[in-house]
Structures are given as C-alpha cells and as structure tokens.
C-alpha cells in the first residue's frame, strides 16, 4: 500500500487551487486521511481502485510534473507511514509493523497536521530543497537542502533575514559541497527526507504553535532548522559566520512587524476596534481630513448648510445630493468631513464621523444566502450603537437591488426602517438620471431621502475651485500653474467641451496639461536616446556572441557597452545641468501656461483654439486667393466664407451660434458644392473632413428621423442619427446640406434650433453641439431667374453694368427663396449668396484646372502630357453652356482628350515614359502626337502644330 503527497512545480502556483482531502478506511478500523493541503497551488484528485485479493490502493492522479514528499515520520521508531511510502509485500505486514511501533494514532496524522498548514512560500522551499538534492545528485533531502531552499526562495521572511546576514545561495552551495560532496548522479523519482530533516519539519510546526500561528511559513522552517541545531545546515551556517541566536532574533522581529502591518492594512480594523464591520467596509473621511489627505473644497456653502440642516432633523435626516456627473457631489461630503475635523459645524453634528461605504466591498464574497444581509445588519447595529456616525453612500442608487437574490430582499428595503426612524444618518449621492430611474420609482425610499440639488458651478466659481486645488496639483506634478492657465482651463472647457460638466472637465484639463509639461521636461535628450538605442543593439550582439561561444567578439562588445554607458551618463549629467539652469531662469521649474491648456483642448476636441500664429495669420489673410485656385469666379461667396472663418478663428464670433450659416443659390454647375469641398480641403484638412448630407435622400416625411436617430422601438434606435452622430464625433467641421430644396419641409423645422442656438437634441435626449460647425446649404431655387437675367451679365459689359445686373438678379432670387422657404428659416441664416452664371473666360480657366487633373493622373503612369492653345479653345467651345455651368466642360474633356488617350494607350502607341502633345488639325480633328515616334495617327508633329503653345 503506497502513499505519497504530490506537490506541483512552481509554474502551477496560483490562487484558487486546493487539495481535496479523501478519507479512506483500512480494514480492522485503521483510519487514515490524505493530507488536505491549504496551500493555494495544488489540485490532487485521489482515485480509488481495488486490487486482487481484496487489497485497496489509493493513487494520486496529477495532470502535471510533480515532486513528492514521502514517508514523513520523525525520529522515533518507524511508523506505518514510513512503510506505506515504500513498496511492501502486503497490507497485513504493514499493519503489524504499525502496531509494533507503539505510536499513538495521532502520530500517524502528522502529515495532515503539517502539510495542510504550509503556506505557498513554505511549499516552494520544500520543492526547491528537492531540486537542490537532484542538482547535487543526492537521493535524500537533508537539513542542508532545506537551508538552500530557504535561501533560494528569495521573497519570504527567512530568505530576507539570511540575506541580511550576508548568506547567499552561491556561497552556501559551495559549503554544502565541501561538507558532503556530490552524489552518484542517479536520483530516484521520489526523494525521501533524512531523519534530521523530518525533525526540522516537526520543530517548525511547534515553532508556529508557540508564535500563535495556524500556518507554517518559511520563517517557521528556518526557526525549526535553527532549533534542531545539528546537521550539515548548522555547520554551513557556522562556516559562513552566521550567529544562530541572532538569526532567530531577526526572524521573530520581522514576524512581529509583519503582524502589525497586516493588522493595520486589513480593512483598518483591529481587535480593540468598536466598529470592525464599518472599518472593514468603509473609509473614514473625517480621519483623512484630519490627516490632510482630502482635496480642499471651495465654495458650495449653500449645499453644505442644507446638508447640515437635514442631518439635524429628528427623523428622515438623510440628505441625497443630486446633480450631473462631475459637478462635485462627493466633494460636498468631503467638505462636511473637513468642517467636522476643524470643528466648524453646529453642535448637532459636532464630533461625528463621516464614513463612506464601499458597496462593492460589502457585496463582494457573499456566496451564500444571508451573508450580505448579515453584514448589513451588523453595519447598522454598529452605527445605531455608536450614534456618532454619518454614513456616506456614493452612487446611492446601487442600494436598490444590491444583494437581492431569489426570495431575498435588497439593501434598500433593509435600510428603509432605520432611515425613516432617524436611527441612521445617511448622505446619498447620485446623478439626476439615476435618481429618476431608480429612486423615484420607489416612493417609499424616495420619501426617506431629502433631495439636495447640486448645480453646475459657473465659470467664475470653477476658476476659484481650480485656484484652491492648484497647490495639490503643483506638488504632484512638481511644477507651477499660471493664473492665466487656470482661467483658460475653466473658460475653454466651458466653451468647447459640451458633453461634460464643470469643474470636473476643467480639473481634468489642468491635470493632463501638468502631466504633459512634466513629461516634456523629463524626456531624454536626443543624443542620449540614440546612445540608448546603440547600447541595446550592442548588448543583444554581445549575448548572441556568448551563446555562440565567440568570446573574443563578446569581449569587444562588452568594452563598447561600457563606453556607451559612460557616454550616456555624461550626456544625462549635462542635460541635468542645463535643466537646472533653465529652472533657475524660469524661477521655479517647469510652468503650465495658457498655451498648454489650449493644446490639450485642441487634442481632445479637434478644435484649433491655440493662439493664431504668424504663419496662420498670413494664411487666413490670403484665404480668398487660395480658394480661387479651385473655385473660379464667385467672388461674393468666397469673400463671405473667408470673413466667417477669420471671425471664428480670432474668437469674435457669437459663442452660442455656429461659425456661419449660408445658403448658396444658383444654377447647376457653377461651383456651389466645389466651394464647400475647397474650403474643407484648405482649412479643415481634407475634403473628407466635411460632413455631406445629400438632401434628396430626405424627401419623405419619415426620413427626417435619419438625421437625429430613430425613436425608441424603431429599427436603428441604437445607431444614432447620421447628422448628430457625425457632429458628436467631429465637432469642428463643415456640414454641407446639398440640394436643400429637395428635402421634406419638416427638415427645415428641425434646423431652426441649429441655426439659432447651435444645438440639437438627438433621439436619446443627448444635446449635440453645433457651435463649432460651418453650415452650408446649396439650392437651385432661382436658377431660372438667373438664366433669364444671365444674358445681360457677361465679360462684354463694363463693371458697373455687371454689378447692377447681379444685384437685380440677387433680389429676384431672394424673392423666390422667400416663396419656397419659411421666413423663420431664412431669417436665421447669416447670408444668402447668389452664384453668378459662368462666363466663357471663366470656363476657360476651369478648363485649365480640369486639364491639370488629367495631367496629374497621367504622371502616375509616367506619361508627360501637353495640350496646345488650339485644343484648349476647342474644349471650351464644346463645353461652354451658360445654362449648365462647368459640367458640360468635363464631358467635353472626357470625349476629346481622355477617350483619344485611352485608345492610344491600349494600342501601345503611347507607353510609359512617352511625352504626348494633343492638338487640333486644320480640319478640327484631335491629334495625339507622341514625343518618341514623332508621328501618331498619321500626322507629323510639324504638320499638325503650326504654332504649338503648350500650356501644361
């Protein structure tokens, strides 16, 4: 009958593992039980099977590599366990030996008493000792191997004490080999313990009992080793110059210190505490306030006074702080704790303690029914007996449903009687939405809490709050904040971060700005970073050389490594001197300025709020010329848009309205949509930065919901609206409503609040901010009027005649717009811009732009294209149509140029690297001439081009 206790190797250490004890009854009443190890590392499953002739055997099945501790019995006569650990002829023989040993039944249960109490570190020591035995080739584990295991474990109390005495693993191994030498090399799978080692394990159990511990750790093993006093381990310690009595003293001292730390950390409670449950599941805010660990609370005087008034009531003395997230509800409770700590409160609450309850900790670990209720009742009983406790529950709506299982009641219902009778003074805090969703649904709970509204502070109040918090953030980030930075944080967060609330968003701004400035000053110099990169490469090459046993190369790499480390140290020292000089020059080190706050806001929102640089100033002043490179003519529209952008960029626009809102009216193909694209590409980064809504998709009444999102219960409710979601993601953008007259009239009703207030509420009730968007609507209304009056507008008229004609047409188009759109819609627009019809001269300039696009596409294929003046005139003649604008021109270029080029490229007459000239012959036919052949399509170059004037 063989027994073994199997231990997993270190990779299997981890929480939540255990050994399940299996009891097995032998014949004739001999009862034994497998060791139920409590160490969090093992999972041994015992399986039982019956051998022939009635013998019963139990094997431990383990799904991992294992080490075994076998036949533990101590120094007395051999016991049943000693023989059970070895192969044996039969059960009756073993039982007789057990009877003849004369030991009590308790002595046979030593393994159970021992190993179920081993800590993770102690098990690791035993495993390491067996590994040391294998390394030395010994087929036993003695005291010397246990000593080596204690040193090798590295993290326990025993290892720390031995290290402090100057005892290391390398020297100890040398001493052990000097004394006992190396073994034969053949080591059995199961390595037994020597009698002295068994004695050490027994003594470690006694030491643990004397210290009042119900576990055996590495420190107890070391104490047992010292108490045994003889054996190889004692000689090793003596040779290394260690004093056993001194080691014992140090171990006991460290054990005592650890116990003190554990008592102070474990929930803050101690054996003498009158409120162990409260201290375990709560945090004493008053104590933190006395220690100065809470942030100062600025303002909020009316709210704190109202809370004190409610707390002084006889019944229902439970205030509930209600406000938006981030307005400072928790800060009011902390402010009350600070006032109590300083004595600045009425006598009704003087000397009381504010404790914040951690609901998550209270619920955590309550596996069985009744555990949560028991904890909560203990908590309430402690508060009732003390009569000096004010309980603060943040996110008080979590009470509803907390701990409720099938057939159980939740925390809110348990607390209701105490809240109503005044036995429990409780401050709750929750958001407006959660209060409506959870607490208002339960009128019985709602009447027990007295609501205290916590409004969002104004910008001026937020600035005062930031000034009060400045010192804490300066100490944390080791820098200074200027007054301008604090003012900018409050103002810019209020203006540009619309989905959050003051003062939280302003505090986050100064916090992140401080982090940015500190990291910027802490960066390594560029030279040091390069050297660090070289050092990593050299170290890698050195290690590879060592692995390949190229020691000469490894030596040269080592020398270079030393040189690089010295260079890095020199660079860092120089950098510190420079930084010190800069800090002295700046009078106090790094400083967070207004520009740092502006940069963080721009990073968060994508809105450029930094001060306008000189480069950007010149760019804004030259905006008209830049836009005219893409949009030909239409000076009025280009000037109006440029004025709006300049106004917004310097901060002179109305902060409660969009940057600008225009309606572009004119005939088709004159550049209405092209101007919006050009503006998006020039100022907002790219054409993709524009939100384009084709209003022909919103012709039916029900499609209006696509803009703001479907109502609840309809398909697409969770996806949000096309307009609102796009603006929420990119608040600084251009929104183009193309062909606005095609939309259903209800769309215009929805746009009224966008144009006036710069805001829109989506289907989920969230407010979307349009204050940083540029709204452009295009329309073809009035195009018939422009077409009729266009005959009197042309390049053959003088300047005054053209202006008067344009003004007359603009007034006519405006009248048509008034007939089509409602007055309240048109009245909210900043400007109604009428686009002129294109003249032939303007069409010629547009032809240049379109031909350049074709040239650019051919350059990708390494083909150089030139066109003559005659060809360009031919394109303009065919593509000019005042009624249709520039779109016929695109069709003419496609037909005359692109089709001819495509045919020649497919026939391989034009290949990569060719230079191509496109001209028109005397008969008006298009001729494509290649620079490599000189003749393409049957015409010589000199015949076709009498006077070629390439423009591109």
From Swiss-Prot:
Annotated EC: 3.6.1.-
Transit peptide as recorded in UniProt: 1-45
Known catalytic reactions: ATP + H2O = ADP + phosphate + H(+)
Amino-acid positions noted as binding ATP in the UniProt annotation, renumbered to this chain: 323-330, 666-673
Cofactor: Mg(2+)
Molecular function (Gene Ontology), one example: ATP hydrolysis activity
Gene null: resulting phenotype: No visible phenotype. Clpc1 and clpc2 double mutants are embryo lethal when homozygous.
Region I, annotated ranges: 278-525
Clp R domain location: 115-257
Pfam families in alphabetical order: AAA (PF00004), AAA_2 (PF07724), AAA_lid_9 (PF17871), Clp_N (PF02861), ClpB_D2-small (PF10431)
Alphabetized PANTHER family for the sequence: ATP-DEPENDENT CLP PROTEASE, CHAPERONE PROTEIN CLPC1, CHLOROPLASTIC-LIKE
Family of this protein: Belongs to the ClpA/ClpB family. ClpC subfamily.
Subunit and partners: Homodimer and homohexamer. Hexamerization upon addition of ATP. Interacts with CLPT1. Interacts with CLPS1. Stably associated with the import machinery. Interacts with CLPF.
Protein name: Chaperone protein ClpC2, chloroplastic
Native source organism of the sequence: Arabidopsis thaliana (Mouse-ear cress)
């Amino acid at each position: 009958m063989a027994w073994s206790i199997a231990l997993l190797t270190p990779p299997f250490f981890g929480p939540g593992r255990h050994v399940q004890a299996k009891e097995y009854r032998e014949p004739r009443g001999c009862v034994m039980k497998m060791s139920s190890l409590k160490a969090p590392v093992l999972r041994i499953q015992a399986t039982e099977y019956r051998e022939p002739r009635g013998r019963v055997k139990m094997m431990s099945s383990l799904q991992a590599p294992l080490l075994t501790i076998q036949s533990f019995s101590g120094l007395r006569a051999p016991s049943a366990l000693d023989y059970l650990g070895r192969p044996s002829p039969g059960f009756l023989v073993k039982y007789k030996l057990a009877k003849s040993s004369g030991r009590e039944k308790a002595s046979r249960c030593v393994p159970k008493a021992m190993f179920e109490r081993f800590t993770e570190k102690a098990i690791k020591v035993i495993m390491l000792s067996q590994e040391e035995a294998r390394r030395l080739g010994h087929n036993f584990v003695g005291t010397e191997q246990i000593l080596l295991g204690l040193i090798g474990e590295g993290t326990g109390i025993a290892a720390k004490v031995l290290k402090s005495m100057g005892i290391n693993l390398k020297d100890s191994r040398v001493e052990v080999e000097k004394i006992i030498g190396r073994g034969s090399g053949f080591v059995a799978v199961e390595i037994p313990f020597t009698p002295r080692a068994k004695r050490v394990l027994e003594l470690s159990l006694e030491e643990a009992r004397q210290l009042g511990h119900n576990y055996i750790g590495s420190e107890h093993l070391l104490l047992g080793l010292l108490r045994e006093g003889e054996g190889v381990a004692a000689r090793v310690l003596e040779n290394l110059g260690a004093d056993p009595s001194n080691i014992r003293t140090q171990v006991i001292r460290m054990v005592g210190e650890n116990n003190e730390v554990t008592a102070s950390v474990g929930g803050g409670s101690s054996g003498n505490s009158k409120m162990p449950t409260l201290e375990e599941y709560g945090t004493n805010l008053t104590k933190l306030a006395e220690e100065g660990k809470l942030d100062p609370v600025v303002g909020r005087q009316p709210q704190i006074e109202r809370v004190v008034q409610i707390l002084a009531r006889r019944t229902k003395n439970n205030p509930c702080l209600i406000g938006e997230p981030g307005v400072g509800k928790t800060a009011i409770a902390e402010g009350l704790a600070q006032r109590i700590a300083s004595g600045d409160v009425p006598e009704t609450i003087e000397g009381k303690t504010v404790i914040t309850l951690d609901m998550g900790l209270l619920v955590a670990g309550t596996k069985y029914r009744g555990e949560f209720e028991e904890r909560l009742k203990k908590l309430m009983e402690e508060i009732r007996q003390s009569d000096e406790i004010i309980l603060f529950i943040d996110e008080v709506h979590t009470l509803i449903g907390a701990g409720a299982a099938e057939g159980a009641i939740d925390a809110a219902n348990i607390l209701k009687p105490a809240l109503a009778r005044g036995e429990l003074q409780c401050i709750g805090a929750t958001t407006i939405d959660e209060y409506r969703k959870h607490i208002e649904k339960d009128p019985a709970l709602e009447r027990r809490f007295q609501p205290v509204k916590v409004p969002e502070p104004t910008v001026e109040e937020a600035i005062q709050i930031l000034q009060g918090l400045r010192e804490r953030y300066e100490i944390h980030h080791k820098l200074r904040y200027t007054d301008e930075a604090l003012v900018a944080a409050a103002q810019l967060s209020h203006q540009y971060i619309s989905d959050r609330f003051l003062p939280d968003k302003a505090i986050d701004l100064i916090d992140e700005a401080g982090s940015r400035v500190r990291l910027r000053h802490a960066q390594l110099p560029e030279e040091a970073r390069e050297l660090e990169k070289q050092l990593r490469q050299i170290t890698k090459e050195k290690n590879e050389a060592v692995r390949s046993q190229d020691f000469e190369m490894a030596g040269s790499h080592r020398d270079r490594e030393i040189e690089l480390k010295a260079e890095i140290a020199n660079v860092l020292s120089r950098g510190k001197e420079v930084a010190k000089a800069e800090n002295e020059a700046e009078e106090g080190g790094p400083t967070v300025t207004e520009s740092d706050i502006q940069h963080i806001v721009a990073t968060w929102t994508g809105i450029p709020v930094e001060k306008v640089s000189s480069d950007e100033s010149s760019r804004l002043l030259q905006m008209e010329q830049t836009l005219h490179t893409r949009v030909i003519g239409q000076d009025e529209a280009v000037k109006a848009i440029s004025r709006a952008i300049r106004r917004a960029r310097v901060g002179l626009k109305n902060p409660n309205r969009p940057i600008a809102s225009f309606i572009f009216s004119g005939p088709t193909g004159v550049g209405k949509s092209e101007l919006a694209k050009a503006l998006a590409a020039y100022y907002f980064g790219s054409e993709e930065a524009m939100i384009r809504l084709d209003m022909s998709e919103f012709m039916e009444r029900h499609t209006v919901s696509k803009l703001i999102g479907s109502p609840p219960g309809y398909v697409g409710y969770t996806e949000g609206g096309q307009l609102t979601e796009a603006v929420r993601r990119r608040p600084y953008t251009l929104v183009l409503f193309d062909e606005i007259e095609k939309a259903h009239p209800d769309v215009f009703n929805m746009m009224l609040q966008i144009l006036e207030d710069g805001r829109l509420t989506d289907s989920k009730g969230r407010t979307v901010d349009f204050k940083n968007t540029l709204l452009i609507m295009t329309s073809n209304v009035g195009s018939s009027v422009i077409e009729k009056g266009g005959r009197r507008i042309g390049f053959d008229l003088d300047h005054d005649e053209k202006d008067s004609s344009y003004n007359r047409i603009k007034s006519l188009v405006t009248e048509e717009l008034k007939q089509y759109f409602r007055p309240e819609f048109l009245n909210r627009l900043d400007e109604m811009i009428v686009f002129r019809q294109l003249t032939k001269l303007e069409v010629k300039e547009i032809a240049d732009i379109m031909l350049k696009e074709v040239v650019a596409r051919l350059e990708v294929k390494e083909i150089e294209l030139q066109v003559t003046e005659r060809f360009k005139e031919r394109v303009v003649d065919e593509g000019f149509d005042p009624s249709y604008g520039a779109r016929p021109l695109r069709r003419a270029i496609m037909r005359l140029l692109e089709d001819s080029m495509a045919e020649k490229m497919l026939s391989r007459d034009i290949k990569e690297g060719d230079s191509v000239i496109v001209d028109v012959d005397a008969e008006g036919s298009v001729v494509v001439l290649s620079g490599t052949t000189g003749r393409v399509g049957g015409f010589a170059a000199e015949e076709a081009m009498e006077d070629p004037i390439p423009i591109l």
